[in-house]
């Protein structure tokens, strides 16, 4: 064999060996996880930040889809994926479709507590979303890589290539218009085109007979009532009036419920002892004073007066 031909063969073998070594280093090819056989067994929730309009504005598209069929149950544009927007989405799906078995998500802070980056989640410490789903008996499953969320990731690739053009053709340039378009038209068209048939007949969704979803899907924090019968909510202290049934709640633990409609409720055990409005539930800015009204219909604690029974008191410190 001529020297030139021998040299060419050696180079070719070297290339082949390097390619084989690289393939072995990568390890086995990741196989796609089989779909769950029935709708309602596993739902995916994920958000995708993208320029959905014909300008430089970025919004998160929050989507909930079924693992068995890829059917979209929820898709809305939000300023940012957060505890409140996730709770809003989950509540809507549960009210319309029913309770599902498990939710698959990434490990962002509104889903899971991760003590250290790269480590497993701490399932003993629940986020607000985790607490709500535990109350409803829904399992939460964390994804540890983008590849593990392949089904939702592939779906977002389709959304990002199609939705901006659809919005442009429809002359839509605001979030409100876009969300209405998604609800009234686009989700149905998307499902008609991309939904697949489930492996098994039937559904794992079960009717939700709970009438307290508004309480479950609220941001809950506990506070100890101060000696002067006040409660700290953000940067304001609220005065609780004396009641005929109990002179004071000082020293007792109450639960502050910050609802998705920006209202606030104060509960002592099963009893609602105050309600009001708070437009800065997740805003770190100072909350302006707002009156809270005792909800007599929800509590056996009758109030001595019905005029502004809970009023803000300016103080410099919080309840411990």
Task: Give the residues covered by each predicted segment.
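Double-stranded DNA-binding cores of transcription factors and transposases
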Residues: 1-26
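Mobile genetic element proteins and their domesticated derivatives, centered on retroelements
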Residues: 15, 46, 64, 70, ...
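Basic, flexible linker segments flanking DNA-binding modules
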Residues: 21, 27-45, 50-51, 115-120, ...
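Mobile-element integrase/transposase regions
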Residues: 27-72, 79-89, 95-100, 131-135, ...
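Residue-level detection of beta-strand-connecting loop/turn positions
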Residues: 55-56, 107, 235, 270
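Acidic/histidine-rich, metal-coordinating catalytic segments
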Residues: 90, 94-122, 143-146
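Charged alpha-helix within mobile-element recombinases
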Residues: 122, 128-200, 204-215, 255, ...
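C-terminal, beta-rich DNA-binding module of retroviral/retroelements integrases
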Residues: 185-318
